[in-house]
């Protein structure tokens, strides 16, 4: 079952192609990353050069794919999109690279999942725009260098720490994407509603924004579900009251937590005394993959002060206790003697 407020991609998000801005000037939020990219793009265009390689990292659903497409549009070049798990063999990458034209953008999503063997092929391609091809086997094998057109690699990852140092060091532009503010999300929601022909009140847009976990992908997904509710059970206009009723039906609370978020926090509080408790233990207790908890759920809980990550494990904060109407335990007092 697809988690409604998961920031992972789903079939429903194919509709987002029509919502994505095509220019940096239309892109909402991420002002620091947007400003830097705009400067570097203008400089590259002024010199008629390919843009330096770009690494975009941050939690899922914040606009990394959108920015990659905007880079290609702003540079006036084509974009070839793929993902790390799809490129299984060096030959797969070689086929992609040899089909690029001058200054094209190659977008690799989940670039941290590239195999070490594939990375070795990517190093000279990024640095020297050359492809090393081995012909033959054994002692008679020889390597020839194939020149590649100068291109821009845009890599996206939710786990920048898993990138090897040699790969990370070859990116000239590294930008971290942050969670969006409520005001930015309300603007995005209003724009999406206009594109879809929906009627939405400013208060309704802000209510959706507050519960979208700082993530545009979640905001657009919630907007489509609330639209269904407004169409069937209201007059078609998404007001604050309609949004509140629809989200209550979907079991999404005031903080944007769904059943999985509540399960994580309540497991730590009720079963493990508030923590610390290991990630694998939490995953086993709620029947979820530990990587999914770490990549998808934890960033929002940590940044909003509901969860602490310590060397001994995860700890529920006083804010988490208050959210569920519980009294946080007193911190242990150290003894002087």
UniProtKB/Swiss-Prot annotation:
Where DNA binds, per the record, is at: 309, 314
Q: Which residue stretches belong to region Small ATPAse domain (RuvB-S)?
A: 181-251
* Binding residues for Mg(2+): 65
Please give the GO cellular component terms listed in this UniProt entry: cytoplasm; Holliday junction resolvase complex
What GO biological process term is on the record, naming one?
A: DNA recombination
Q: Which GO terms describe its molecular function?
A: ATP binding; ATP hydrolysis activity; four-way junction DNA binding; four-way junction helicase activity
Its subcellular locations are: Cytoplasm
**Ligand binding (ATP):** 19-20, 61, 64-66, 127-129, 170, 180, 217
Catalytic activity reported: ATP + H2O = ADP + phosphate + H(+)
Its top-level enzyme class, in one word, is: hydrolase
Q: How does it assemble?
A: Homohexamer. Forms an RuvA(8)-RuvB(12)-Holliday junction (HJ) complex. HJ DNA is sandwiched between 2 RuvA tetramers; dsDNA enters through RuvA and exits via RuvB. An RuvB hexamer assembles on each DNA strand where it exits the tetramer. Each RuvB hexamer is contacted by two RuvA subunits (via domain III) on 2 adjacent RuvB subunits; this complex drives branch migration. In the full resolvosome a probable DNA-RuvA(4)-RuvB(12)-RuvC(2) complex forms which resolves the HJ.
Domain writeup = Has 3 domains, the large (RuvB-L) and small ATPase (RuvB-S) domains and the C-terminal head (RuvB-H) domain. The head domain binds DNA, while the ATPase domains jointly bind ATP, ADP or are empty depending on the state of the subunit in the translocation cycle. During a single DNA translocation step the structure of each domain remains the same, but their relative positions change.
Q: What is this protein called?
A: Holliday junction branch migration complex subunit RuvB
The organism encoding this protein is Citrifermentans bemidjiense (strain ATCC BAA-1014 / DSM 16622 / JCM 12645 / Bem) (Geobacter bemidjiensis)
Gene (name only): ruvB
């Amino acid at each position: 079952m697809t988690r409604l407020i998961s920031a992972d991609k789903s079939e429903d998000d194919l509709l987002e192609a029509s919502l994505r801005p095509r220019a940096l000037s239309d892109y909402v939020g991420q002002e620091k990353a947007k400003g830097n990219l705009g400067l570097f793009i203008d400089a590259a265009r002024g010199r008629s050069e390919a843009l330096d390689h770009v690494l975009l990292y941050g939690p899922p659903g914040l606009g990394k794919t959108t920015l990659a497409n905007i880079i290609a549009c702003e540079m006036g070049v084509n974009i070839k999109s793929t993902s790390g798990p799809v490129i299984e063999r060096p030959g797969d990458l070689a086929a992609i690279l040899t089909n690029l034209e001058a200054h094209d953008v190659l977008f690799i999503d989940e670039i941290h999942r590239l195999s070490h063997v594939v990375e070795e092929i990517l190093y000279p391609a990024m640095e020297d725009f050359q492809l090393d091809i081995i012909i033959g086997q054994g002692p008679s094998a020889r390597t020839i260098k194939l020149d590649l057109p100068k291109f821009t690699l845009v890599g996206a990852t939710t786990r920048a720490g898993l990138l090897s140092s040699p790969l990370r060091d070859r990116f000239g532009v590294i930008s971290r994407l942050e969670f969006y503010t409520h005001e930015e999300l309300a603007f995005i929601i209003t724009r999406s509603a206009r594109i879809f022909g929906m009627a939405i009140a400013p208060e309704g847009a802000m209510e959706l924004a507050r519960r979208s976990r700082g993530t545009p992908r979640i905001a657009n997904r919630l907007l489509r579900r609330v639209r269904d509710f407004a169409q069937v059970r209201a007059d078609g206009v998404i007001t604050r009251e309609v949004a509140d009723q629809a989200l209550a039906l979907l079991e999404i609370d005031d903080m944007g937590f769904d059943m999985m978020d509540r399960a994580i926090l309540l497991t730590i509080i009720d079963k493990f005394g508030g923590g610390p408790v290991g990630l694998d233990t939490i995953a086993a207790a709620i029947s979820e993959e530990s990587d999914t908890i770490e990549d998808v759920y934890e960033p929002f809980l940590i940044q909003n002060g509901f969860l602490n990550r310590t060397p001994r494990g995860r700890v529920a904060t006083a804010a988490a206790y208050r959210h569920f109407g519980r009294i946080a335990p007193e911190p242990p007092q150290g003894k002087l003697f």
